[in-house]
Amino acid sequence: MINDIKKDAQERMGKSIEALSRNLAAIRTGRAHPSILDSVKVTAWGSEMPLNQVAAITVEDARTLKIVAHDKNLSAAIEKAILTSDLGLNPSSAGTTIRVPMPALTEETRKGYTKQASGVAEDAKVAVRNVRRDALADLKKLTKDKEISEDEERRAADEIQKLTDKFVAEVDAAFKAKEKDLMAV
């Protein structure tokens, strides 16, 4: 039972870290990276589809992404989707190829993105701590129902705290890496 609680907590904390990674990847830096466009949805064939399912996205150079639509009729829809996304990008189209230059980030923009990354990291920490709270509540319930002793509960709670500390440290490390990436000129 205790192992199930710990395993569940570890899986849920891991999912929080995965979500953090996705959210941090969506915050753009000055460099071109295909994951910047992960949040872009294109209206294609009557439904909203992720951009990476309707086009090939490659890095042309350090500041330019190249997008080649799988279907040439989608080029205009892809360009519109990128323009209407809140990424602040201006694609230029040449036939079936769309180039997306990454504008240089100003100091003010960098600070804004760093603040956004900080908020995302804080949300991830809160999610990890909520998982800890749930796991500790489950342990308390087992102790109350006399399924485990108080000593076992205390030991398991210590292990869950260590797990929480480990995942919070991972969140901090991911944020520091993103902050360093954002502040690099």
Curated annotation (Swiss-Prot):
One of its GO terms (molecular function) is ribosomal large subunit binding. It comes from the Bacteria. The keyword Cytoplasm applies. NCBIfam families: frr. Responsible for the release of ribosomes from messenger RNA at the termination of protein biosynthesis. May increase the efficiency of translation by recycling ribosomes from one round of translation to another. It holds the Pfam family RRF. Disulfide bonds: none annotated. This is Ribosome-recycling factor. InterPro entries: Ribosome_recyc_fac, Ribosome_recyc_fac_dom, RRF_sf.
